[in-house]
From Swiss-Prot:
Locations listed in the record: Cytoplasm, Cytosol
Keyword Iron-sulfur annotated: no
G3: region residues: 85-88
Record-given protein name: GTPase IMAP family member 4
Main localization (coarse): cytoplasm
Main function: During thymocyte development, may play a role in the regulation of apoptosis.
Species in which this protein is naturally found: Mus musculus (Mouse)
Gene: Gimap4
Family, similarity comment: Belongs to the TRAFAC class TrmE-Era-EngA-EngB-Septin-like GTPase superfamily. AIG1/Toc34/Toc159-like paraseptin GTPase family. IAN subfamily.
Region (G2): 64-68
Region (G1): 37-44
Known tissue expression: Expressed in thymus (in thymocytes), spleen (in splenocytes), lymph node and lung. Expressed in B-cells and T-cells (at protein level).
Length: 328
């Protein structure tokens, strides 16, 4: 099966096959969310709050606890909820080899593209340094990505009795400019919340994400680099699926030979039928394993180091530039 690779643009989910979305033959829709922000903004804690369990390492630390892009999956409202936590790869001024690798991993884990890019910013003293980090992220993703972005303000509990609108009115001008960039699409989060408050803020955020997805016509954010990476992932997924298919055929041929060898020496017809029934059961067992392997092939591909090398090679051939990696 040949995989055709197109150009940049917005990808409607309905136009993609199930294995492109990582759910071969299951038909489960995905909602892919990426956490972006400066080191120490609280991305990992936010990811844990969204997923409802501690799956990302988080804590108070001067250095980033998250060292590599990590992907965790849960279910919500009949969808596969995919959350990708990113390290401080967007803090670096000039991407080095490690940064390039993490950018590649980020694209591989979110391909064919995220539905929502959450820029995590803690409430409090929004400094010029923090503003520069925010602008760097916005610049790297380009104007096209704004339609898919939500400003997620953490440390809601620090507001205490202060009204959020009053807080925003008194915020520095450059922070208000960021709010304008996001068309006032923001959500407040308290990562220390528990019980009803925790569930309510999760519902508010995911409802906002769903609303944004509808506004975007059910499309995910993509561009030429995503298209190139998705093409590589699809090709490798199909290659792995074909290897599993060949393995199944070899196994079935071996089982058939063994049982036919046994059956030919049997004179009792009932015993022959029993052996044939056993053979069919073994066939079904192998086919069940094959089906599971087929469904998980894409996830296997995404988790190999080889796929990162293949994507980087494809990007080098296409002359993509890492420090402009998300621009149109």
């Amino acid at each position: 099966m040949e995989v055709q690779c197109g150009g940049a643009g917005f990808i409607p989910e309905s136009s993609r096959s199930s294995h492109e979305l990582g759910n071969q033959d299951q038909g489960i829709p995905q909602l892919r969310i990426v956490l972006l922000g400066k080191t120490g903004a609280g991305k990992s804690s936010t990811g844990n709050s969204i997923l409802g369990e501690k799956v990302f390492n988080s804590g108070i630390c001067a250095k980033s606890i998250t060292k590599v892009c990590e992907k965790r999956v849960s279910t919500w409202d009949g969808k596969e909820l995919v959350v990708v936590d990113t390290p401080g790869i967007f803090d670096t001024e000039v991407p080095d080899a490690d940064t390039q690798r993490e950018i590649t991993r980020y694209v591989a884990l979110t391909s064919p593209g995220p539905h929502a890019l959450l820029l995590v910013v803690p409430l409090g003293r929004y400094t010029v340094e923090e503003h520069k980090a925010t602008q760097k992220i916005l610049d790297m993703f380009g104007k096209q990505a704004r339609r898919f972005m939500i400003l997620l303000l953490t440390r809601k509990d620090d507001l205490e009795d202060t009204d959020i609108h009053e807080y925003l009115e008194k915020a520095p001008k450059f922070f208000q400019e960021v709010m304008h960039e996001f068309q006032n699409r923001y959500c407040l989060f308290n990562n220390r919340a528990s019980g009803a408050e925790k569930e309510e803020q999760k519902m508010q955020l995911l409802t906002l994400v769903q609303s944004m997805v509808r506004e975007n016509g059910g499309r995910c954010f993509t561009n030429k680099m995503y298209e190139s990476a998705e093409c590589v992932i699809q090709k490798e997924t199909l290659r792995m699926q074909e290897l599993y298919r060949e393995e199944l055929e070899r196994e079935k041929a071996r089982i058939r030979r063994e049982y036919e060898e046994q059956i030919k020496d049997l004179r009792d017809e009932l015993e022959r039928e029993i052996r044939r029934a056993r053979m069919e059961r073994e066939f079904k067992e192998r086919e069940a394993i094959f089906t599971k392997n087929q469904q998980n092939a894409r996830k296997e591909v995404e988790n190999t180091s080889m796929i990162l090398e293949l994507i980087i090679k494809a990007w080098e051939i296409a002359s993509f530039i890492f420090n402009q990696f998300m621009k149109d």
